């Protein structure tokens, strides 16, 4: 299963947020051997960018570990609103 998590962050906080979320993903990659990606919308709207964290081929328990790591990281203080999580299966592996 792959996780795609998106949310909005003030454009003015982009540099600080990038530092924090990159450290989070590096740590999760090291601890749980997951592949990660980080994306951001190219243009800010209303002073905000949409960001997306991607976690590929994770097991069902990873989501709990991820939320614990996010809570400990302080990311939530820089996010406007909620983190939205979508789960997807790679169908090329399921066929």
Which residue ranges define each predicted feature?
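A common structural junction motif
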Residues: 25-29, 70-79
């Amino acid at each position: 299963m792959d996780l795609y998590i998106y949310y909005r962050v003030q454009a003015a906080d982009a540099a600080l947020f990038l530092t924090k979320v990159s450290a989070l993903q590096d740590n999760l990659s090291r601890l749980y051997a997951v592949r990660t990606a980080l994306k951001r919308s190219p243009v800010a709207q209303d002073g905000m960018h949409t960001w997306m964290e991607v976690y590929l081929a994770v097991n069902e328990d990873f989501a709990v570990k991820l939320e614990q790591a996010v809570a400990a990281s302080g990311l939530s203080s820089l996010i406007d609103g909620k983190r939205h999580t979508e789960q997807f299966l790679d169908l090329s592996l399921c066929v």
